[in-house]
Amino acid sequence: VAFSENGVQLSLAYSEYPTSAGAGDMNADTIFDAAKDVIARCVSGGKVERSDVAAISVTSFGEACVPVDREGNCLCDMIMYTDRRGVSENERLIEKLGRKYISSVTCANPAPMYSLPKIMWMSENISAVRESAFRFLQAADFICYRLSGEFTTTYTQACRTDAFDVERLRWSPELLEAAGIRMEQMPDPVPNGTVIGLLRRELAAELGLSDTVKIVAGSQDQIAAATGAGVLSAGQAVDGTGSVECITPVFDRIIKSEGFTSNNYVCVPHSVVGLYATYA
């Protein structure tokens, strides 16, 4: 979607990236090609002047991540959150650190849907990942990397790994160590809205855009929906519909009660500094 600086929608493009029936994984290169396609179509047709494009931001689903090597090449497909790989790995994490401790750090009930147990599965079962993984990136992280050359993630995306310390806004050394993952294999976490770099020159030429276009960290999709709907204060909520229906209420503090997380409610940073949200 292309917006003016005042938030007026100027153009819209949509692209599917179908997978085989019953598959629990997705090709990250295919997703990036679709992203390029919708960017190109958003700035074609005369509704948007290419020279006026100032920034590109990306929002995506969470959990699923792709391992890349030093050159940014994908080492395997992304394992989606619906895939059952990672069940035994999640149990091992709980046995090592305890469910209560993990929840106290991540503000989430540990589950195999998150990135960390799936990263463990990939590292233990795919030799290319075990030998060459340089970064583990979620979908938005991967697209932003391909656009800018920078390895980053947003706080809201990082929370979907079950390896992020919500209170300290950093990767948890204890969780990564328990999973056998090095800290440097994770992208740098930044606040939503951070300018992470400029559009790569070769992509600028391909898309007909300026290489001064800023690449801006977006957010996990439900937080983006809340922000776009104007849910910017504690006590407000949005009901978003799409592939799933999700109610996103906003709080002015971190909620860490055992009853909250045991019922599978999370607590994640909002796009507005000092606010937090959950998904229901």
Q: What residue ranges belong to the model's regions?
A:
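N-terminal glycine/serine-rich phosphate-binding loop of ATP-dependent small-molecule kinases
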Residues: 1-77, 88, 104, 132, ...
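Acidic-glycine-rich active-site phosphate/pyrophosphate-binding loop
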Residues: 10-14, 88-89, 192-206, 250-262
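Residue-level signal for inorganic ion chemistry
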Residues: 7, 56, 83, 122, ...
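Glycine-rich phosphate-binding loop of actin/hexokinase-like ATP-binding domains
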Residues: 65-70, 74-90, 133, 137-172, ...
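Gly/Ser/Thr-rich active-site cleft segment
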Residues: 102-220
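Residues that line or immediately flank small-molecule/substrate-binding pockets and catalytic motifs
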Residues: 17, 60, 82, 193, ...
